[in-house]
């Protein structure tokens, strides 16, 4: 379960940012996680609650934006969002697509203070 190590890294980064900003508490952490990032959102939420205990993030809400897979279709010459991220075929023309534009993200976007 690598979500626990990810949660610890989020807590470390956010705690350092809180200390640098001179705040003692973080109320929310905003993340963007791509469908291909290999992260289970519920497992990350559970792990985050454990990792945040005793830190400025102890009462913080973890807000996750799930990013769908977007690829470039060379046949249609456009970016398309895949309805099924396991099939890398353009939903318009059915041809294979290989260039991933979005969907691998794992980004800490913002921190919110009370």
Swiss-Prot record:
Zn(2+) binds at residues 73, 76, 90, 93. It comes from the Bacteria. Pfam families: HypA. InterPro entries: Hydgase_Ni_incorp_HypA/HybF_CS (IPR020538), HypA/HybF (IPR000688). Belongs to the HypA/HybF family. Involved in the maturation of [NiFe] hydrogenases. Required for nickel insertion into the metal center of the hydrogenase. This is Hydrogenase maturation factor HypA.
């Amino acid at each position: 379960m690598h979500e626990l190590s990810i949660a610890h890294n989020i807590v470390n980064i956010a705690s350092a940012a809180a200390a640098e900003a001179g705040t003692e508490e973080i109320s929310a952490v905003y993340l963007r996680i791509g469908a291909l990032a290999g992260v289970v959102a519920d497992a990350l939420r559970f792990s985050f609650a454990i990792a945040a205990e005793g830190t400025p993030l102890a009462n913080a809400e973890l807000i996750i934006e799930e990013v769908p897979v977007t690829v470039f279709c060379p046949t249609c010459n456009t970016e398309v969002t895949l309805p099924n991220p396991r099939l890398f075929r353009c939903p318009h023309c059915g041809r294979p697509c290989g260039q991933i534009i979005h969907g691998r993200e794992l980004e800490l976007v913002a921190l919110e203070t009370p």
